[in-house]
Amino acid sequence: MCKILCSTGALIGLPNNRNYKLLKPLSKELLCDGFEFMMYSSWYDKTDEITGFLQDTGLYTPVMHCEKHIGEAISKNETDEALCLFKINCNMAQEINASKLVIHLWDGITSDQNFQNNLRLYKELEEISNSYGLCLLVENVVCNAGNPMKHWLELAECYPGINFVFDTKMAAFHQQLELLYSEEYKWLWQDGHIKHYHINDYAGGYMEWEKLRSLPLGAGNIDFKKFFSFIHKVKYNDTFTIEATAFNQNGEVDTDMLNRCFENVRHYLKEI
């Protein structure tokens, strides 16, 4: 059965001082089926505190999103740092009973400019995540040299068992959403490589960096009716995460907006 998750990154950010303890009261207002826990770089000195908090609150967190600087370190060939941080993220995911671990295999200004670094290190990352009982998912992160679907293909050629998380916003940014439905990329769903989806809208054109924001469904130009028709066609029946930024500059969280997103996804899933 499909589960609709909320990214904790949609709730917790700099405007509310990345106060993870807000998750307890906010979770009571949200009509999602669980959460995708987003790790931040400022939390490495309190990992035990955070995992203990999540265990005590009993939040259902089947997915964890790695801290994004790991991908940047990989891109810069800072291998030791990347692996050290990745192991910390894996341990946290195991502690909060997540089964899926999302990673930005490339990130930052360096992005995919040195993609051979990212390609080479994947094998070790997968081995580490497997040792923690986690399914590692590589996201179709935006690029400033190549494009994510091309890199997915390169990764799959080297590592046939690789798994992915598909982000609708990231795909729309590169005008690659249609590739998901194409004959060229049908191997992604025929062979079950996509294990998770990030559902975000996008209101820009091709690679409009200033418009690269996580928007709620309906606030951009993505055809979600077509997307969910595809989801039905390929019989995908697993997890989705809503990531639309819900906090304002004062740190106040618009839970009503997120609940509308959850309801919209449920409507699409029932309608088809």
Regions found by a protein language model. Give the residues of each.
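Histidine-acidic metal/acid-base catalytic patches
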Residues: M1-T8, N17-K28, N97, E124, ...
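Acidic-and-aromatic substrate-binding clefts and catalytic sites of carbohydrate-active enzymes
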Residues: L11-R18, E36-E49, I70-D80, G108-Q113, ...
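Conserved beta-strand positions in the central sheet of alpha/beta enzyme cores
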Residues: E36, V63, V102, L137, ...
